[in-house]
């Protein structure tokens, strides 16, 4: 076997011969030879050979079988070489394997029995251990419950004992009735003594101790619920709690009336210990805040001498601020002391603001009504200022956030219906502009009003400016609704732009004028000059001082917000500027319509030279002089010189002259075209007559044609027209329509040179 391994190289390392590359591989077989049949369970060698001998020679079959045998031998050798090490090791272990198995079986069975027995012992010990631990746990739980019950009993007894001590303390000598809240009737002489102050402080310290014990008692009760012992003690606990609340309330009121800082500290810590902050806040509200607020905010049904409503709150807030600074500041400072644990109290919201809200709702409910926008805004801003004053007593930003999140603060802000207020202001401002824009004609501002109108001329423009300014007036704008007023501002600008553009489009389409568009139908060119002037003034104001005023008012906002506002206002100014080209085009149309009235005389040129013997014309037609007269008169008029910019005047001049020239050229080209067609037809008729008559015509072909005379007349006219255009400051050669006109009527030798 070793020789076989040594002499048989691995298939992967054996060199391949040329036969492997250029001839059939070793394992290739003819189609009739199928080695897979040898593996069939029903294979019979004799029948297999007998079947093949009928069509395969015996030598060929033998050669193929030997070749297949050699291939199988090679595969067997490769298999042995691949797993030789494992094969040898396995052969050494297989010697007397049965006897070895018998010898190993007995120890293994013995070991299994020992392991099974040990496992049973361990499980029994584990079960016993678990039972012991469970019993210990149950005993510990029972001991804990017992200790809890004992502690509860001791605490209840201790609380009752301390409460019994309370009536015997010297501080109760000032009040015979333990259930009375009338601490204000105490003997001032005794309450100012040093011993009396010490007694109050001693009682407050004792109450703080009782509150601490009550806090422990609540903890015990929370961990021992539904136990009969606890249920039996509930009455005692409840009675102690009621007595504690009553005594603590008396002591707290006494401390408030006497401004005793130590007593207030102790009482507030006691309230915080028993988690009853609402009681302290309510006592402070009813005892200190409510009496004063009721004196300030009283029923008033008349109006003062100035005619203002008595629902105004500004004066009331001033008195309340003075009261807070004088009588409430001490308690507010105590409750906001750093690291005192008293931040759980919110006297600002639940005592002061709560009482103020209730008083306003009861006595002055009209203060919350947005039906009177001016009074509403005044009260709203006064209330915001009052809230800011209260927030000034908050020691930190988190305290301010907590104050704003209080339910009473949220309820207070809900009373101010800013949405309805804005709707009323919207109707007021937008209605004023809409009323001005629905006028059937342009309304001019009187001279006495021009100083306050930014040099505006039209009442419609002045109304727009006043409405825009009203949106951001101090007595109109609500900062929380600034986004809505910004939207209203943009809507006002858009409404004015639509008023101008829709009227101009209506005039252009010659449709029946809709409401607000009648003014454009009857307006003159000078009227449109006023509109252009006002639009330019409005754009300058909106994108200048007006935008600066808005940015200054919103200076507390973020940069992103200011950028959005600036872009929005600038876009509103752009919407106004977009109507300027429409206005300019309308003025051009008005001027052109006046100018082209003289072009009707152009048709007379045909009658002048048709079927006549007139010589070539040598001077221009009279109508040419009047073509540009409306343009010149308009641009040199006072309205254009005073209210139009140089750029606008240049646009009007160029646009008017170009349009007049275009119409002039179209009409002249039509006249020339008709004349040439007529001449061509007449010439054909003459030629036909000559052919029929056989004689020469009496008319010489060398004479100047009627069409040439017309073109010469038009050429003289266009030269004069060009001189008039030059007099206005334009170059005729720069006008495409003029160049086309020149080439249409100029003689052949002057087609390429325009000279006037």
Swiss-Prot record:
One of its GO terms (cellular component) is plant-type vacuole. Its main location: Golgi. InterPro entries: COG2, COG_complex_COG2_C, COG_su2_N. Residues 173-199 are annotated as: Disordered. GO terms for biological process: Golgi organization; protein transport; regulation of exocyst localization. Keywords: Coiled coil, Golgi apparatus, Membrane, Protein transport, Transport. It is a peripheral membrane protein. Residues 62-82 form a coiled coil. It is found in: Golgi apparatus membrane. Pfam families: COG2_C, COG2_N. One of its GO terms (molecular function) is protein homodimerization activity. Required for normal Golgi morphology and function. Ensures, when in complex with FPP3/VETH1 and FPP2/VETH2, the correct secondary cell wall (SCW) deposition pattern by recruiting exocyst components to cortical microtubules in xylem cells during secondary cell wall deposition. Belongs to the COG2 family. This is Conserved oligomeric Golgi complex subunit 2. It comes from Arabidopsis thaliana. The lineage of its organism: Eukaryota, Viridiplantae, Streptophyta, Embryophyta, Tracheophyta.
């Amino acid at each position: 076997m070793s020789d076989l391994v040594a002499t048989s190289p691995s298939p992967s390392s054996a060199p391949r011969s040329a036969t492997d590359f250029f001839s059939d591989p070793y394992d290739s077989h003819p189609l009739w030879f199928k080695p897979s049949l040898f593996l069939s369970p029903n294979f019979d060698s004799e029948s297999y050979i007998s079947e093949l001998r009928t069509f395969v020679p015996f030598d060929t079959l033998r050669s193929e079988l030997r070749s297949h045998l050699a291939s199988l031998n090679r595969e067997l050798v490769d298999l042995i070489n691949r797993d030789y090490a494992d094969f040898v090791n396995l052969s050494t272990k297989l010697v007397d394997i049965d006897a070895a198995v018998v010898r190993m079986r007995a120890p293994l069975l013995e070991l299994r029995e020992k392991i099974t027995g040990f496992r049973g012992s361990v499980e029994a010990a584990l079960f016993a251990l678990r039972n012991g631990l469970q019993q210990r746990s149950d005993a510990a739980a029972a001991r804990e419950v017992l200790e809890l019950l004992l502690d509860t009993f001791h605490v209840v007894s201790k609380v009752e004992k301390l409460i019994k001590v309370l009536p015997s303390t010297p501080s109760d000598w000032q009040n015979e009735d333990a259930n009375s809240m009338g601490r204000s009737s105490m003997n001032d002489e005794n309450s100012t003594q040093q011993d009396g102050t010490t007694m109050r402080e001693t009682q407050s310290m004792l109450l703080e101790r009782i509150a601490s014990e009550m806090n422990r008692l609540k903890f015990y009760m929370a961990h021992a619920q539904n136990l009969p012992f606890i249920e039996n003690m509930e009455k005692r606990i409840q009675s102690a709690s009621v007595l504690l609340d009553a005594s603590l309330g008396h002591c707290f009121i006494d401390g408030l009336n006497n401004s005793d800082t130590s007593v207030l500290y102790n009482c507030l810590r006691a309230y915080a210990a028993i988690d009853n902050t609402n009681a302290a806040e309510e006592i402070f509200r009813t005892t200190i805040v409510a009496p004063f607020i009721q004196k300030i905010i009283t029923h008033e049904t008349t109006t003062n001498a100035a005619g203002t409503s008595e629902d105004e709150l500004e004066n009331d807030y001033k008195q309340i601020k003075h009261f807070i600074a004088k009588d409430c500041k001490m308690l507010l400072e105590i409750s906001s002391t750093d690291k005192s644990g008293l931040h759980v109290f919110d006297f600002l919201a639940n005592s002061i603001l709560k009482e103020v809200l209730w008083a306003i709702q009861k006595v002055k409910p009209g203060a919350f009504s947005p039906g009177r926008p001016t009074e509403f805004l005044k009260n709203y801003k006064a209330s915001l200022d009052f809230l800011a004053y209260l927030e000034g007593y908050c020691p930190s930003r988190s305290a301010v956030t907590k104050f704003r999140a209080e339910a009473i603060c949220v309820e207070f802000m809900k009373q101010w219906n800013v949405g309805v207020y804005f709707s009323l202001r919207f109707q007021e401002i937008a209605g004023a502009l809409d009323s001005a824009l629905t006028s059937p004609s342009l309304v001019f501002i009187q001279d006495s009003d021009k100083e306050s109108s930014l040099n505006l001329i039209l009442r419609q423009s002045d109304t727009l400016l006043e409405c825009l300014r009203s949106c951001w007036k101090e007595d109109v704008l609500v900062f929380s609704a600034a986004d809505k007023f910004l939207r209203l501002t943009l809507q006002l600008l858009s409404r004015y732009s639509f008023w101008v553009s829709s009227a101009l489009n209506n005039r252009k389409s010659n449709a029946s004028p809709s409401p607000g568009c009648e003014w454009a139908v009857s307006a003159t060119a000078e009227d449109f000059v006023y509109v252009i002037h006002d639009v330019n003034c409005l754009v300058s104001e909106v994108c200048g001082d007006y935008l600066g005023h808005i940015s200054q008012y919103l200076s507390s906002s973020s940069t992103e917000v200011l950028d959005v506002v600036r872009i929005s206002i600038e876009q509103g100014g752009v919407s106004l500027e977009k109507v300027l080209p429409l206005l300019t085009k309308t003025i051009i149309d008005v001027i052109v319509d006046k100018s082209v009235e003289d072009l009707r005389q152009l048709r007379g040129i045909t009658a002048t030279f048709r079927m006549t013997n007139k010589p070539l014309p040598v001077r221009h037609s009279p109508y040419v002089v009047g073509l540009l007269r409306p343009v010149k008169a308009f641009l040199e008029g006072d309205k254009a010189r005073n209210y139009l910019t140089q750029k606008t005047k240049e646009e009007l001049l160029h646009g008017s002259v170009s349009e007049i020239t275009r119409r002039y050229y179209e009409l002249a080209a039509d006249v020339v075209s008709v004349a040439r067609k007529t001449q061509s037809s007449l010439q054909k008729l003459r030629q036909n007559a000559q052919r029929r008559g056989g004689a020469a015509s009496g008319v010489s072909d060398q004479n100047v044609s009627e069409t040439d005379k017309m073109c010469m007349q038009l050429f003289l006219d266009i030269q004069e027209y060009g001189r008039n255009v030059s007099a206005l400051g334009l170059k005729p050669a720069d006008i495409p329509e003029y160049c086309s006109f020149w080439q249409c009527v100029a003689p052949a030798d002057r087609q390429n040179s325009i000279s006037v």
